Amino acid sequence: MKAFTKITAIVAPLDRSNVDTDAIIPKQFLKSIKRSGFGPNAFDEWRYLDHGEPGMDNSKRPLNPDFSLNQPRYQGAQILLTRKNFGCGSSREHAPWALDDYGFRAVIAPSFADIFFNNCYKNGLLPIVLTEEQVDRLFKEVEANEGYQLSIDLAEQTLTTPGGETFTFDITEHRKHCLLNGLDEIGLTLQHADEIHAFEEKRRQSQPWLFNG
């Protein structure tokens, strides 16, 4: 998992509430259990004018010019700004995989669906909760300023605008530690590999019948 420390990046607006996981990555693309390769189909039904299916050459598909992420000014964005209850619907972990593979490192919203919120942290994607008033202000600034960028400092838990205004956000110490160090659940477990091996060896000696056969 990629570590997250600091970024300064373009912000792409998605001015919709209640964006569900089927909108983030439609169900027909869920056949793979690899974490990569979902980016070209993120927001597929809004992003393209035709119906997408696995195996299609996305470079030849007609783009929807009205979809914000297709606009030239938002190309290369690493921060997604959206509205309340983002990531609702089914619990598919493919949704944060698709956002990460698209290139997003952080998502800002007034609220997130709980399962999606937790899945973001497991996959190196930082979900930032701000108030609706703060999100409204950011939408206005993004719309008014082409190439608008925000700076996110995870260690300090701050988000800074080009004008120097700073917002703070909450995150548990455990989640912050994992993101700063690029640790998913497997990586976190491997940090304790020596203790695990020592425990297993001690148990092997004290309860050998468990290991016979």
Swiss-Prot record:
Pathway(s) of this molecule: Amino-acid biosynthesis; L-leucine biosynthesis; L-leucine from 3-methyl-2-oxobutanoate: step 2/4
Q: Name one GO molecular function term.
A: 3-isopropylmalate dehydratase activity
User: What keywords are annotated for this sequence in UniProt?
Assistant: Amino-acid biosynthesis, Branched-chain amino acid biosynthesis, Leucine biosynthesis, Lyase
Tell me which InterPro entries the record gives.
3-IsopropMal_deHydase_ssu, Aconitase/3IPM_dehydase_swvl, AconitaseA/IPMdHydase_ssu_swvl, IPMI_Swivel, LeuD
Q: Which domain of life is it from?
A: Bacteria
Q: Which chemical reaction does it catalyze?
A: (2R,3S)-3-isopropylmalate = (2S)-2-isopropylmalate
A cellular component term, taken from the record's GO annotations: 3-isopropylmalate dehydratase complex
The reply on keyword Amino-acid biosynthesis is yes
Q: Which Pfam families match?
A: Aconitase_C
Q: What is its EC number?
A: 4.2.1.33
Describe the subunit structure.
Heterodimer of LeuC and LeuD.
Tell me, in a sentence or two, what this protein's role is: Catalyzes the isomerization between 2-isopropylmalate and 3-isopropylmalate, via the formation of 2-isopropylmaleate.
The record, for HAMAP family, names: LeuD_type1
Protein family? Belongs to the LeuD family. LeuD type 1 subfamily.
How is this protein named in the record?
3-isopropylmalate dehydratase small subunit
Source organism (scientific name):
Neisseria meningitidis serogroup C / serotype 2a (strain ATCC 700532 / DSM 15464 / FAM18)
Gene encoding this chain? leuD
